[in-house]
Amino acid sequence: MKKKALITGVTGQDGSYLAEFLLAKGYEVHGIKRRASSFNTQRVDHIYQDPHVDNASFILHYGDLTDSSNLTRILQEVKPDEVYNLGAQSHVAVSFESPEYTADVDAMGTLRLLEAIRLLGLEKTTKFYQASTSELYGLVQETPQKETTPFYPRSPYAVAKMYAYWIVVNYRESYGMYACNGILFNHESPRRGETFVTRKITRGLANIAQGLEKCLYMGNMDALRDWGHAKDYVRMQWMMLQQDQPEDFVIATGVQYSVRQFIEWSAKELGVTLTFEGQGVDEKGIVTAIEGDKAPALKVGDVVVQIDPRYFRPAEVETLLGDPSKAKQKLGWTPEITVQEMCAEMVMEDLKVAQRHALLKLHGHDVPVSVE
């Protein structure tokens, strides 16, 4: 019998990579996607299987973390061996604008899943993975951050995720469920949402290089982050559910860099050298050298990075650096893709899209505008 996995957030970055990973291991993979007026399955279209075909291994269900009856029905139908709760309102800035919705999805959504598993009598047979977040550490109390570091959340998103973290621990201890938290530090890929900072950088600079945009507007470029590749991190998520006993783990690389450095690497992949001048809101990124033919729209002296105060958070998280030593010692997990390799991959994918759009624009066609 194939193992069955249920993934919430299957159409997102992590969900799509995890679905690929589990399918390669012979799982029957069920994913929950939200109803929308337009298709939102681009990240999983390449693994789509016709549900009318016998023995389909990848099945999508309409669902929502805000609807307990819906979640209960799906769990009752699938009876999964493993549940990966990756669905969330995961944008920190958006959580300040929509705090109640963020709490309903990220905090209560986790509770709804756990309670449905318990009420259906699956608590002894279904393993549960919760995608937790390094944003729990917020105003960091120690560096690097490990599993025992105290939490100090600094956004409605982080507060909602803290509730989810502790309700997972509570159900594990109260009902003997195999339920665990993976405290994920920042992880990226070409499938990262376009409004997240790394993808905003790679997509924005690729568009600027092709003449589709004029400038990349940033917030806090001094912020320090521990970045890894989503492919490495979903492998760790699976490993966490293959142990005899459930435990919580930090998932990180143990190395940190600034947002400014990520901008510099991205520009370099386009053959562009940037120099930053000025301080605070007056800081600018200026082109000082160009090599190759990947940035035909740029010339030396162009200002391509500026600060927009709108992108500063109400409460900043200045530094995040994970300590993955427990994951390495207990599970043998180490990341295989470096942050520089990941950055190069992201830039090249966004450059391909920008080049196509530039060609369309040249021939008089409309092209998509950038999103903030």
Curated annotation (Swiss-Prot):
Pfam families: GDP_Man_Dehyd. The keyword NADP applies. Keywords: Lyase, NADP. Its cofactor is NADP(+). SUPFAM superfamilies: NAD(P)-binding Rossmann-fold domains (SSF51735). The keyword Membrane does not apply. GO terms for molecular function: GDP-mannose 4,6-dehydratase activity; NADP+ binding. It catalyses: GDP-alpha-D-mannose = GDP-4-dehydro-alpha-D-rhamnose + H2O. NADP(+) binds at residues 9-14, 64-65, 86-90, 101, 161, 187, 192. Pathway: Nucleotide-sugar biosynthesis; GDP-L-fucose biosynthesis via de novo pathway; GDP-L-fucose from GDP-alpha-D-mannose: step 1/2. Its EC number is 4.2.1.47. InterPro entries: GDP_Man_deHydtase, NAD(P)-bd_dom, NAD(P)-bd_dom_sf. Belongs to the NAD(P)-dependent epimerase/dehydratase family. GDP-mannose 4,6-dehydratase subfamily. Catalyzes the conversion of GDP-D-mannose to GDP-4-dehydro-6-deoxy-D-mannose. This is GDP-mannose 4,6-dehydratase.
